[in-house]
Every structure is written in C-alpha cells, then in structure tokens.
C-alpha cells in the first residue's frame, strides 16, 4: 500500500512539474506562433523541422543533442532537416544536402560533412570539392554531380527558400513545429531546453488534434 501511495505521489509530482514547465513557455518569448501556418509535408503527422547550415558552429554543436532525440520520436511525429538558404556558401551547402537527401545517403554522411568543415577545416565550396570528399565516404561521384546539377534539385532549392521565408527564419539552428511554432536555441535557453520546448509543442499539437 505504501508503495502504491508513493508511486501515486511521484506521478502527481511529475504531472505538476510538467504543468509548471508548460506554464513557463510563452508565445512571443520562448517561441513565436506564426500568423500564417505553413502546410506540413505529411498531413496527419506532427512535423518538426530543423533549419540548419553545415557551416554553422551552433548547428554542429547541436548535433549530439538533436540526433538521438530525433531518432526516438514517436510514429506520429515526422522530423525534417531543411537547409537554410541565405545565399552564397549557404546555398552551396544547402544544395549539397538536398542532393545527398535525394540520393538517400544523407544519413550516412551528414555527420561526416559537419566534421569535414568544423574539424578538418574543409570549405566544400564547389561541386567538385564536395564530390571528391564524398567519394571518400562511399558516395558515387558521378551520380552526385549529375544529381547536384539536376532540375529536380533546383526545384527543391526553390521550395526550401520559400519554406524558410514562410517560417520567417533569420538564423540557425531554428526549429518549427507543425508549421505553426518557431523557436531557436537562444529563445529556448540552450540545446536541451530547445528539445524540451519541442516536446511541449508536439504534445500541444497532439492534444489539439484530439479535440
């Protein structure tokens, strides 16, 4: 009986703690509620988008936190990486990511690209430089180059630009939940806090869908 009471008390304490944490999140402070929600790519699922740039040190530092979190998301949540395209080298790296994603190998080399830029100080600033580096990681060089320069990738680049504009993104890493809520490490208070906020907003959307 004592164990049951203790379990119940712990459960209630946990619930009160979650409620208190939820009360601490304020639209306009930790996150922004977009005035015009952006349609998600998979209707019926809660979409979580991470906007990033391979050259961003904060994005690189965020990887050890967000990767394990994203791999444990429940089936009703769809996680999407989206390159932020602010021109210049941002677009070059963004086109590389979209090419790798189209080839189905982004998961195999995503971390390697980050490390090449931030640890090995490679620029990866041209298609040829990227292709040579990626070939050493098992990516078909000719296929990469042909895909990189394809009309399909150019179309995906335009789509990514429009999404970033719709999300009103000004920096990275930035996260958007279900096309409605935008926030970043600065507004949330750190990497771990960013994912706690993401969890809260995911649950908020899940609860709203049940009403």
Curated annotation (Swiss-Prot):
<keyword id="KW-1015">Disulfide bond</keyword>
<feature type="signal peptide">
    <location>
        <begin position="1"/>
        <end position="22"/>
    </location>
</feature>
<dbReference type="InterPro" id="IPR001853">
    <property type="entry name" value="DSBA-like_thioredoxin_dom"/>
</dbReference>
<keyword id="KW-0732">Signal</keyword>
<dbReference type="InterPro" id="IPR017937">
    <property type="entry name" value="Thioredoxin_CS"/>
</dbReference>
<protein>
    <recommendedName>
        <fullName>Thiol:disulfide interchange protein DsbA</fullName>
    </recommendedName>
</protein>
<keyword id="KW-0574">Periplasm</keyword>
<dbReference type="GO" id="GO:0071236">
    <property type="term" value="P:cellular response to antibiotic"/>
</dbReference>
<keyword id="KW-0676">Redox-active center</keyword>
<feature type="domain" description="Thioredoxin">
    <location>
        <begin position="23"/>
        <end position="203"/>
    </location>
</feature>
<feature type="disulfide bond" description="Redox-active">
    <location>
        <begin position="56"/>
        <end position="59"/>
    </location>
</feature>
<comment type="similarity">
    <text>Belongs to the thioredoxin family. DsbA subfamily.</text>
</comment>
<dbReference type="GO" id="GO:0015035">
    <property type="term" value="F:protein-disulfide reductase activity"/>
</dbReference>
<dbReference type="InterPro" id="IPR013766">
    <property type="entry name" value="Thioredoxin_domain"/>
</dbReference>
<dbReference type="InterPro" id="IPR023205">
    <property type="entry name" value="DsbA/DsbL"/>
</dbReference>
<dbReference type="Pfam" id="PF01323">
    <property type="entry name" value="DSBA"/>
</dbReference>
<dbReference type="GO" id="GO:0003756">
    <property type="term" value="F:protein disulfide isomerase activity"/>
</dbReference>
<dbReference type="InterPro" id="IPR036249">
    <property type="entry name" value="Thioredoxin-like_sf"/>
</dbReference>
<dbReference type="GO" id="GO:0030288">
    <property type="term" value="C:outer membrane-bounded periplasmic space"/>
</dbReference>
<comment type="function">
    <text>Involved in disulfide-bond formation. Acts by transferring its disulfide bond to other proteins.</text>
</comment>
<dbReference type="InterPro" id="IPR050824">
    <property type="entry name" value="Thiol_disulfide_DsbA"/>
</dbReference>
